[in-house]
Swiss-Prot record:
Family in the record: Belongs to the phosphoglycerate mutase family. BPG-dependent PGAM subfamily.
Organism whose genome encodes this protein: Macaca fascicularis (Crab-eating macaque)
Disulphide bridges, residue numbers: none
Residues recorded with modification N-acetylserine: 2
Record GO biological process: glycolytic process
Binding locations of substrate: 10-17, 23-24, 62, 89-92, 100, 116-117, 189-190
Protein name: Bisphosphoglycerate mutase
Origin superkingdom: Eukaryota
GO molecular function, one term: bisphosphoglycerate mutase activity
SUPFAM superfamilies: Phosphoglycerate mutase-like
Taxonomy of the source species: Eukaryota, Metazoa, Chordata, Craniata, Vertebrata
Its EC number(s): 5.4.2.4, 5.4.2.11
Catalysed conversion reaction: (2R)-3-phospho-glyceroyl phosphate = (2R)-2,3-bisphosphoglycerate + H(+); (2R)-2-phosphoglycerate = (2R)-3-phosphoglycerate
Keywords attached to this entry: Acetylation, Glycolysis, Hydrolase, Isomerase, Phosphoprotein
Length: 259
């Protein structure tokens, strides 16, 4: 029986989403389409009369800005927002900045699918020579984390994402939900997938089939033990949402040349 409701989402579209590049921990901002997605998400939640008590985001701009735009549409700008690196996107290591379609051409679509969607396959780690290494690890936000800088990931599988996310869920977010607070989590594709895996009990094998579009609110109904009582629900125009899911799934495929 449903006792609690949780809303989560993947942030709105950013420039590198549109360019089909692995963004990961690079602090790309929302583009105009992403801002519109966030505003539409806020309108959708307003139409359903959601009133939030707390918002949780990653420390990346696109996650935080999405939350701000949603709260603005709701007229709930005063709601506290808390940010943690533990909700960050998956660290894609050496793949950061690379184009997914080009990677599919170089390594095959199945390898790219495994890097993007599988549970326990880790991409090659980022090295100091990587063009975005210093931009990430010299950033002040990572010098005030709850772990030392040298213990932050250099690459992650989805399993790794879940392992660094769970302590934050268990110690910070879950207690607020259990107190009856209405919580919004504005995160990323893979941190959201990892949390869905945990709450819904999705198997290691089946998680590869879970795809989340940008800027679409997801409703989870939870029991007294904070386990999902049914599958997650995308809120909004279902036909448009399915088209958006397919768009994400196709990012790691080689487009057919026009005749």
């Amino acid at each position: 029986m449903s006792k609690y409701k949780l809303i989560m989402l993947r942030h709105g579209e950013g420039a590198w989403n549109k360019e089909n590049r692995f963004c990961s921990w690079v602090d790309q901002k929302l583009n105009s389409e992403g801002m519109e997605e966030a505003r539409n998400c806020g309108k959708q939640l307003k139409a359903l009369n959601f009133e939030f008590d707390l918002v949780f985001t990653s420390v990346l701009n696109r996650s935080i800005h999405t939350a701000w735009l949603i709260l603005e549409e709701l007229g709930q700008e005063w709601v506290p927002v808390e940010s943690s690196w533990r909700l960050n996107e998956r660290h894609y290591g050496a793949l950061i900045g690379l184009n997914r379609e080009q990677m599919a051409l170089n390594h095959g679509e199945e390898q790219v699918r495994l890097w993007r969607r599988s549970y326990n396959i880790t991409p090659p780690p980022i090295e100091e020579s990587h063009p975005y290494y210093h931009e990430i690890y010299n950033d002040r936000r990572y010098k005030v984390c709850d772990v030392p800088l040298d213990q932050l990931p250099r690459s992650e599988s989805l399993k790794d994402v879940l392992e660094r996310l769970l302590p934050y869920w268990n110690e910070r977010i879950a207690p607020e939900v259990l107190r009856g607070k209405t919580v919004l989590i504005s995160a990323h594709g893979n941190s959201s997938r990892a949390l869905l895996k945990h709450l819904e009990g999705i198997s290691d094998e089946d998680i590869i089939n879970i795809t989340l579009p940008t800027g679409v609110p997801i409703l989870l109904e939870l029991d007294e033990n904070l386990r999902a009582v049914g599958p997650h629900q995308f809120l909004g125009d279902q036909e448009a949402i399915q088209a958006a899911i397919k768009k994400v799934e196709d990012q790691g495929k080689v487009k057919q040349a026009k005749k």
